[in-house]
């Protein structure tokens, strides 16, 4: 796909407040994410996410994030929240991820104890997850959660992917311009980079992040 014909999509993850969701919509963010992974400080209950979903602007995707949740837990979220996209950060295989009849993203851990450049090759990923809508490369280690605020070496991203990919892990308004110019992702996913505290977003950081993404897009088009 010709990257120059596309703008960088933006996903704000770890949403816990309706006001933050409304602001994300006003800023033109493409997707907001609710976290249902056990142990996450940004975890919300399905009923809470359902209530906050009402604040979502039209044409903004609602993403449900899981990490080794049971099939019953995922089904409850799908039924209660009605997300448009699922995101899996654990050891879930393709059969599990696609069993909910919704498009899904598969996260690839790129932390120091995660996959190395040899393991994270496009062929292996696409053979393992042939039905994924795309991949998300994050800085956490296998079995760990995102939102750490740490980056990884972007040069380790696999080449030759035939699916869109999102870049995550330690991205904020100070480095997202360089991240986009360096990696040309289909989208960027941010949580801690626009926060005051886990789950509590900062309006100024949200605005600045979006501005920097748009600046990078204009740079790529010039």
Swiss-Prot record:
Alphabetized UniProt keyword annotations: Amino-acid biosynthesis, Aromatic amino acid biosynthesis, Isomerase, Tryptophan biosynthesis
Catalytic reaction list: N-(5-phospho-beta-D-ribosyl)anthranilate = 1-(2-carboxyphenylamino)-1-deoxy-D-ribulose 5-phosphate
Enzyme Commission identifier(s): 5.3.1.24
GO molecular function: phosphoribosylanthranilate isomerase activity
Transmembrane spans: none
SUPFAM superfamilies: Ribulose-phoshate binding barrel (SSF51366)
Keyword Isomerase appears in the UniProt entry: yes
Biological process according to GO: L-tryptophan biosynthetic process
Gene3D superfamilies (UniProt xref): Aldolase class I
InterPro entries reported for this sequence: Aldolase_TIM (IPR013785), PRAI_dom (IPR001240), RibuloseP-bd_barrel (IPR011060), TrpF_fam (IPR044643)
Keyword set includes Cell cycle: no
Stated family: Belongs to the TrpF family.
Protein name as catalogued: N-(5'-phosphoribosyl)anthranilate isomerase
Organism whose genome encodes this protein: Xanthomonas axonopodis pv. citri (strain 306)
Gene: trpF
């Amino acid at each position: 796909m010709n990257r120059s014909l596309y703008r960088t999509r933006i996903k704000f993850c770890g949403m816990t407040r309706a006001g933050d969701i409304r602001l994300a919509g006003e800023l033109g963010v493409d997707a907001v994410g609710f976290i249902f992974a056990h142990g996450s400080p940004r975890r919300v209950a399905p009923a809470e996410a359902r209530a906050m979903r009402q604040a979502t602007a039209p044409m903004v995707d609602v993403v449900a994030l899981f990490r080794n949740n049971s099939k019953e837990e995922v089904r409850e979220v799908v039924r209660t929240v009605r997300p448009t996209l699922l995101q899996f950060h654990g050891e879930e295989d393709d059969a599990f991820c696609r069993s909910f009849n919704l498009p899904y993203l598969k996260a690839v851990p790129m932390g120091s104890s995660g996959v190395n450049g040899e393991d994270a090759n496009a062929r292996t990923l696409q053979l393992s997850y042939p039905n994924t809508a795309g991949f998300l490369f994050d800085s956490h280690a296998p079995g760990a959660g995102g939102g750490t605020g740490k980056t990884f070496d972007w040069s380790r991203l696999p080449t030759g992917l035939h699916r869109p990919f999102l870049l995550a892990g330690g991205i904020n308004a100070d480095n997202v311009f360089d991240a986009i110019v360096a990696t040309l992702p289909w989208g960027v996913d941010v949580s801690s980079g626009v926060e005051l505290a886990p789950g509590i977003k900062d309006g100024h950081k949200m605005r600045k992040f979006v501005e920097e993404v748009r600046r990078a897009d204009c740079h790529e088009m010039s």
